[in-house]
Swiss-Prot record:
Taxonomic path: Viruses, Riboviria, Orthornavirae, Negarnaviricota, Polyploviricotina
Purpose of the protein: Multifunctional protein that plays two independent roles: viral suppressor of host RNAi (VSR) and viral inducer of host attractiveness to insect vectors (VIA). Acts as a suppressor of RNA-mediated gene silencing, also known as post-transcriptional gene silencing (PTGS), a mechanism of plant viral defense that limits the accumulation of viral RNAs. Also inhibits signal transduction by the phytohormone jasmonate, making the infected plant more attractive to aphids, which are the second host to play a role as a dissemination vector. Acts by binding to and inhibiting MYC2 transcription factor.
Keywords (A to Z) from UniProt: Host-virus interaction, Inhibition of host innate immune response by virus, Suppressor of RNA silencing, Viral immunoevasion
Pfam families assigned: Tospov_NS-S_N, WIV_2
Name of this protein: Non-structural protein NS-S
InterPro entries: NS-S_bunyaviral (IPR004915), NS-S_N_bunyaviral (IPR053928), NS-S_WIV_bunyaviral (IPR053929)
The keyword Nucleus is assigned to this record: no
Quaternary data: Interacts with host MYC2.
Originating organism: Tomato spotted wilt virus (strain Brazilian Br-01) (TSWV)
Protein family according to the UniProt entry: Belongs to the tospovirus NS-S protein family.
A Gene Ontology BP annotation from the UniProt entry: symbiont-mediated suppression of host innate immune response
Amino acid sequence: MSSSVYESIIQTRASVWGSTASGKAVVDSYWIHELGTGSQLVQTQLYSDSRSKVVLWLYCKVGIFPVKKKRFLSQHVYIPIFDDIDFSINIDNSVLALSVCSNTVNANGVKHQGHLKVLSPAQLHSIESIMNRSDITDRFQLQEKDIIPNDKYIEAANKGSLSCVKEHTYKIEMCYNQALGKVNVLSPNRNVHEWLYSFKPNFNQVESNNRTVNSLAVKSLLMSAENNIMPNSQASTDSHFKLSLWLRVPKVLKQVSIQKLFKVAGDETNKTFYLSIACIPNHNSVETALNITVICKHQLPIRKCKAPFELSMMFSDLKEPYNIVHDPSYPKGSVPMLWLETHTSLHKFFATNLQEDVIIYTLNNLELTPGKLDLGERTLNYSEDAYKRKYFLSKTLECLPSNTQTMSYLDSIQIPSWKIDFARGEIKISPQSISVAKSLLKLDLSGIKKKESKVKEAYASGSK
């Protein structure tokens, strides 16, 4: 996609920043670079909320492979072990991409945090606690684009009601190589033979509030725009690594244990991979612990790659990416067209009387305040968010799952007056012009009442 599209997505997501009712819903983005070369070892996005927890850990010293029979895998591998999450691994010439997505995840309206780190095999000396960007690029061989996003993306976030300016200095912190994410919940170990250097932007704004963010948060928004909302992890296969991912998912999955030692057909760089998956359900707390480990090891000497190779591994019963597949739990007949026509007419009437957009469905878990619109013959109840946007939500639509599959399903119904915004995770209706509204003012309420009676008759006959 073009940069202008990314700017639009960033502005849209910035406008709903932190609109979830739970302040614990957050996307943490991490960029880990190699000391000496500045090359990127890992970029990852980890989603967590009050129940979903994710931890990722990268090691560069991988040790010895477990004893397993080695296999060659080529092109596409389908392993149906999960029926309720989308889990896939893709390996090409130099990148391994790992993606885990559950329909319990709603990344609309969450806050973003960015974390820039450099991995070192030894502790460095003479590192100042505060450094500017030019010193960081010289000392750690990073490029400026690794540290800060382009100005146009910062401007897009500011148009979306955030407050961000480019920082000039960064606080440098050092620790042993350890897990990233919700470590306090899942508590993996740490590696005392490798060091992580973190670069934290220093705010240069005199006054800050909950809309004030640093540039790495905007970089995280950009990464989510590029990933199409689906958090994933990518690791460079140009060197040894061990990537471990711990997840706590708020649903019960079936117990699974898989170990595979394999090479990729067509890979002339002579790399060996090891994959371990352990899925441990807990029926009492209605959650599942999912542990995934991928090891990449080069069999020296490393030969220069002569031919491209690719391997995709799908571990889900879903035949399509989870963000576009239609959940069979709600077929198209689940929302009657007569009901949709009735409520769409009411929504249009309400929007026209207010002369502003009305949101009729949202994925965002917002804190709303009630309001009333007196129309003489009747009073309509609605809701407002903190930004005075109007909501006229339906209990019937709220019964559908709050995820992007529902958005895709509602989009497929093709109601002409609906404006579906996948980036914001909402559906809205715009008002008609005032001249049209006046001509229809006397007709709408009586027509709506007639349609409501038809709906009641239809439901009554269907329940018999």
